[in-house]
Each structure stands twice: as C-alpha cells, then as structure tokens.
Amino acid sequence: MTILVLGGRGKTASRLAALLDQAKTPFLVGSSSASPSDPYKSSQFNWLKRDTWERPFEQAGKHGLGTISSIYLVGPPVMDIAPPMIEFVDLARAKGVQRFVLLSASTVEKGGHSMGQVHAYLDSLAEVEYVALRPTWFMENLLEDPSREWIKNENQIITATGDGKIPFVSADDIASVAFHCLTEWGSHKTEYVILGPELLSYGQVAEILTTILGKKIIHRSLTETGLAELLVKKAGIPADFAAMLSAMEVDVKNGPQEVLNNSVVEVTGNPPRYFKDVAEHEKHVWA
C-alpha cells in the first residue's frame, strides 16, 4: 500500500517525504515540478491541470509501488480551494483510496471557508478515514521571502499582528504528526489542532532573533490595509490573497491564537520544537 504525498516541494510535504523515506514506507510524491532528478519517486500533479490528476495512480505501478491507499492533501494556491480538492477526492476514492490526511489551519473550522469545506466533505463520507491537521502559524515562514529579506536586509519583521501572541509551530512537527496519521491506521475521522510549545508575539520573536543574530531586529506592526499594500508592492502577492493574509494577521490582535495544547506529543511521542532552537539552526538564512 502506497502513500501519495501532494505538495511535494512544500514545507510540510518535503519533510514528510523524508520521514517516509527513512521509515522505508512506500510513497510517491506528486508535484507540478516533478522530474527524474527528484530525490524520491515522483509524478506530475498539478491542481490546476485536471489531466495530471490520474498520473500518480498510473506512475505508482511504473515505479514498482503498490496501489495508492492514502493521500496527504495539500491544497492549490488559489482562493476557491474547495471545488478542485473535492473533485479530486472523489477521483481518488474511485481509485481505491481509503484514507486522507488534510493539511488545513488552526483558524479554519470544519465547514468554514476554503479547507473547512474540504474537511466537512471528508467528514460526510462514511467509507473513508481522514485526519484534518490544523496547524497554527509556521515558524519556517520567517525563512522565506518577504520575511527573510526583511530580517536579513532591513533588520525588521513586518506584520499587522500588534502585540498578539501565537503558538508558532515548526513544519518538522507538522510533518511528524502527518507521518503518524498516515502510517498508523485507526484514527478514523478526527482532527488535530497542531500548536507549538509557547506563546510568542512577533516582538518577542524579534528579541530572540536579536540575540541569535547579534544584531538588533525590530517588529514593525502595520495596519491591515498597510500590510496588504506592502505585500502586493514588495512581494508581488495577488491583491485578494494579500488582503486575506492581512486580515488573518489583524485577527491575532484579538487573542484567538493564545492557546496551547499537547497534540504534537500525544500523536508523535515527542514535544514540539521551540522557536529559539529552530532559529539557531537556521540562522545562516538571515546572515
């Protein structure tokens, strides 16, 4: 039985693939940029091109793998995310897939917008098992532009979160939870809100980076509109997506993210990583 990992080059999927490889668990990576030089067996898969959706099921046999029985679902980079994902879930079910692990978000309830619609659809299917992973904000987002560039070149983190606190979580821990959910059957229909071990404001994150990098890093908090405009102008993010991201950041000010739980250790047996440890390991990115 083979696991299909979608979003193959993403933060969680790439880490999940490494864990599956280490465990010698049969898997296939689905990616729009799949090539023969990939480190793992892979297949073309593009959410925006339906003619690629069946290729992983065809390629599994060509790669000498068994039938695909489980899928790690990472959605496409579009606003209306649910229709193509639900259509693909139906295709996969017709191919014999029995379990789905969905990457959603802590702020998206079952039945809510985007991934929440996919979550609700999976829950409505009597014959499949699923786990919805609902992680909070990724620590590793600071390793990518525009945040990386702001920290490296401007000595600042720019958000619209004010002094609101977030239980930042590492993509390593999300991947570890996904690994256990995909390889240890029996969870049936459930969800895990995946949180880090501590609550941090971006001001506190800046203080940690100041200590680790040996230079003063500040947190600059903008208005919702100000951040959206900056993301469009400096990062080239589409206006509608930038507006959504900015609204999510402003919501942090009201404290809905200020919670902790034990999901990571309960599922994996290991405690989640602290931001200071991730930052110390990755500090070369901001040097």
UniProtKB/Swiss-Prot annotation:
Statement: the UniProt record of this protein carries the keyword Cell inner membrane: no
Catalytic activity annotated for this protein? festuclavine + NAD(+) = 6,8-dimethyl-6,7-didehydroergoline + NADH + H(+)
- Keyword field: Alkaloid metabolism, NAD, Oxidoreductase
Query: EC number(s) for this protein?
Result: 1.5.1.44
* One of the GO BP terms on file: indole alkaloid biosynthetic process
- What GO molecular-function term can you cite, just one? oxidoreductase activity
Pathway(s) of this molecule: Alkaloid biosynthesis; ergot alkaloid biosynthesis
Stored InterPro entries: Ergot_Alk_Oxidoreductase, Ergot_alkaloid_biosynthesis, NAD(P)-bd_dom_sf
Q: Which domain of life is it from?
A: Eukaryota
Known role: Festuclavine synthase; part of the gene cluster that mediates the biosynthesis of isofumigaclavines, fungal ergot alkaloids. The tryptophan dimethylallyltransferase ifgA catalyzes the first step of ergot alkaloid biosynthesis by condensing dimethylallyl diphosphate (DMAP) and tryptophan to form 4-dimethylallyl-L-tryptophan. The second step is catalyzed by the methyltransferase ifgB that methylates 4-dimethylallyl-L-tryptophan in the presence of S-adenosyl-L-methionine, resulting in the formation of N-methyl-dimethylallyl-L-tryptophan.
Q: Which PANTHER family match?
A: PRESTALK A DIFFERENTIATION PROTEIN A (PTHR43162:SF1), PTHR43162
Homology family:
Belongs to the fgaFS/easG family.
Q: What is this protein called?
A: Festuclavine synthase II
